[in-house]
Amino acid sequence: MKNKEKFQGELSESSIARMIKAAPLHDIGKIGIPDRILLKPAKLTNDEFEIMKTHTLLGAGAIRKAIEQSVEIYNKNELSKPLSLLFLEDAEVIAKFHHEKWNGQGHPYGLKEQEIPLSARLMSVADVFDAVTTNRVYKRK
């Protein structure tokens, strides 16, 4: 995929490495979801599902805060922003957009097709694979 012309600018070795490092943070916003919803062993109600969907923005917001605090520390100490912070910027994008759908029916913004950042599209595929191959509290074993 990285050798295809249309992905040349987005899939360099360094961007792939950052995505791999950032991917585990994609659901970090679930820490803000009440356990009664997150661990519910049955189908969520519409209201519960609306709350669950907020994990994308909660996660992106938490990562944004970490970026801002890190940059503030670097600026205060007159240090240049390290390249390692780039993975947090990628993590913010992945956390925010990994539930967008190609057809525009996803959340939080209803983005579609190329509007969805490539890193989030790739995370979405991995997230679906994980969902269908992993036991969850709400799935029968």
Give each language-model segment a name.
Residues 1-141:
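Histidine- and acidic-residue-rich, metal-dependent catalytic cores
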